[in-house]
Amino acid sequence: MGSLTFWDVTIEFALEEWQCLDMAQQNLYRNVMLENYRNLVFLGIAVSKLDLITCLKQGKEPWNMKRHEMVTKPPVISSHFTQDFWPDQSIKDSFQEIILRTYARCGHKNLRLRKDCESVNEGKMHEEAYNKLNQCWTTTQGKIFQCNKYVKVFHKYSNSNRYKIRHTKKKTFKCMKCSKSFFMLSHLIQHKRIHTRENIYKCEERGKAFKWFSTLIKHKIIHTEDKPYKYKKCGKAFNISSMFTKCKIIHTGKKPCKCEECGKVFNNSSTLMKHKIIHTGKKPYKCEECGKAFKQSSHLTRHKAIHTGEKPYKCEECGKAFNHFSALRKHQIIHTGKKPYKCEECGKAFSQSSTLRKHEIIHTEEKPYKYEECGKAFSNLSALRKHEIIHTGQKPYKCEECGKAFKWSSKLTVHKVIHTAEKPCKCEECGKAFKRFSALRKHKIIHTGKQPYKCEECSKAFSNFSALRKHEIIHTGEKPYKCEECGKAFKWSSKLTVHKVIHMEEKPCKCEECGKAFKHFSALRKHKIIHTGKKPYKCEECGKAFNNSSTLMKHKIIHTGKKPYKCEECGKAFKQSSHLTRHKAIHTGEKPYKCEECGKAFNHFSALRKHQIIHTGKKPYKCEECGKAFSQSSTLRKHEIIHTGEKPYKCEECGKAFKWSSHLTRHKVIHTEEKPYKCEECGKAFNHFSALRKHKIIHTGKKPYKCEECGKAFSQSSTLRKHEIIHTGEKPYKCEECGKAFKWSSKLTVHKVIHTAEKPCKCEECGKAFKHFSALRKHKIIHTGKKPYKCEECGKAFNNSSTLRKHEIIHTGEKSYKCEECGKAFQWSSKLTLHKVIHMERNPANVKNVAKLLNISQPLENMR
């Protein structure tokens, strides 16, 4: 590597560029250049103090503003003019001779200029010689370029040629690695270091290496511990003048650069200039590929990478690739786990300064970006731009496959993957494939078992940062996203977007198979799986298969038994946060969603929607086994289990199995005998809150559910449904052993025990055994001698509520069970069953069936 010169760390401006700078920017340029110069001298590196340093020290401009032909220094052949700009050696030599001959007229015949300065002393000699030369320049500047030939030569090969290259918009220097083009060779050389990862400038103190010399200079100041820039007000000292300036602004509160348009103030003029573009609305930088325009050229350059799809910068840690090196650098901080940027207000730390800046706005509550249409204000410009799209309703990015349109190109890119069945990103651990590398990366964390992101509030750990962020909202309870239509608020904008569809009646996504329409494409995609019959997501624990991964994940929680979401009101715990949210509505008693048809109110909009189907009379979900139709798919799914007979949820205490996990949960309470839910009216306690709620209706005396057949009213809809079966006479639940049919599955379950001699439930008090735990529980009351169930009519007390209910019928005299054969009525269904035997006896063919029906072996004569 050749000897380092001052020009290696020099910032250059063309004449026209210098004229564009304001006073503050020119002063900043002077400070930076002089600081670089002082640093080089301090390090003992030979520096030739050329005219630029002389001008800057004297406070003069580095450009002669009177004559546009003038350049930073007289046209001396210095190291600054590289071979790139002198293609012909003879022209270079002759040009030097012309200049020297011209200066000889002033008496400086022996003036000699060296190409490079090899020491500091030579640099001083060169400076003295140059000062003399500069004197000649001022006296003869009107004569030097009299000859047009020499003016043309100068303009062709001078430093100003670099500026001309920029205006031609030609980028002649191309990187062979990533095809990026540059105006100047020096920029290409700097860029190449990114690919080579070459750190040629090494610190002798610690051995740390840097790509650029300017970064090394800044780094070396750390080792000197010299902090010459001290602010008297707070006593704080700094290595760099720019840090001192920032500190000063904090204390004084002065921001010298103010926008005349909106009054916003900035620390420096360059930021102000960028800001001013917002008000002009101009977007001069246009993409030739898609026509999208940008306010800054850097934004256009970034955008172009989208069309090429090229991501040359790859992370060695996780393999993720990026369009830009800056994005890779930001990403790499994640792997270090460092968060050097701390908020002084709340102490929260961040990995990037930009994220800290965004966060700090929260404490100031400043929202300078206001939308004129609706008056809504935002803390940052990007949020304002996103909001603007809501009002315009524009969706310029359209999917060619299904016609779905999007507001942002990124959303379209994500959507396109849906149409391709390709999953190129495969997990080496379990073989699972993904469409995107980001999804694979998230999945891989599962195998490591690591959960590095911990909640400070409840110590719950997460495998990714986004999951932690979502979780933290639970503790704050904040719901910033509000629906303008119904006022409902949400924690996340995505939930609000999904909710808004409810208010629209449009269902653009239609199933070609069955014609069913959906509001979201995602819902249609899930629906289509039903037609294929595929269930690719299988539970490793129990072998149960599912249509989608989300259902499988929910199912897996059953096996863990974890219930992390707890109600603060009653202590009840839930497996999912959504279930807790639903539960909370019970305590508030609020029912904002009302049915216009019948006036019934609901806690959730989904419950209202399900209810409204009842009024339409539609039952689109049909059972393929028995043809029975249902208004909801969930009810159909529950019904289908009847035919399969599957009971995957088993009680570890008594071995009883259930079709649904909710039933198992309810059952488990029996073994604990805990009854935390107490009625304030009568003191009766219950295992479940739902049982207490049902009980409370008794005290109100209300019976809103009426039977259309006989006019009998009930306090609960479930009781009405059970009652209606009496009139239909339907008995869908049949015993495979003896053929006996039942109206309810629970009755069939109880009946099945008859065929088995097994009695697993034994009384510890007297040794009596029972087939059902419920029978044992009833029996145990006998030993206590308690009779908590009392008849209000006659005062008679009973061990259990069912016996009390049977007794109460005596006082009412009601006989709801009627024989279709002879019209005779009975108070209990069991009596009606016995009575029916009389009619069946007349037909000898039915005798065997009657015996089976009643599960008896004795002659029927004995029963009359």
Swiss-Prot record:
**Phylogenetic classification of the source organism:** Eukaryota, Metazoa, Chordata, Craniata, Vertebrata
Show the GO MF annotations: DNA binding; zinc ion binding
**Family as reported in the entry's similarity comment:** Belongs to the krueppel C2H2-type zinc-finger protein family.
An example of a Pfam family matching this protein is zf-C2H2
Its recorded name reads Zinc finger protein 99
Cross-referenced PROSITE patterns, in alphabetical order?
KRAB, ZINC_FINGER_C2H2_1, ZINC_FINGER_C2H2_2
Q: What is one cellular component GO term in this UniProt entry? A: nucleus
InterPro entries (UniProt xref): KRAB, KRAB_dom_sf, Znf_C2H2_sf, Znf_C2H2_type
Q: Which GO terms describe its biological process?
A: regulation of transcription by RNA polymerase II
Q: Where in the cell is it found?
A: Nucleus
Function noted in UniProt = May be involved in transcriptional regulation.
**Which stretches of the protein fold into C2H2-type zinc fingers, per the record?**
173-195, 201-223, 229-251, 257-279, 285-307, 313-335, 341-363, 369-391, 397-419, 425-447, 453-475, 481-503, 509-531, 537-559, 565-587, 593-615, 621-643, 649-671, 677-699, 705-727, 733-755, 761-783, 789-811, 817-839
Q: Does the keyword Ribosomal protein apply?
A: no
Q: Which residues form the KRAB domain?
A: 4-75
Extract the SMART domains matched here: KRAB, ZnF_C2H2
What keyword terms does UniProt attach to this protein? Answer: DNA-binding, Metal-binding, Nucleus, Repeat, Transcription, Transcription regulation, Zinc, Zinc-finger
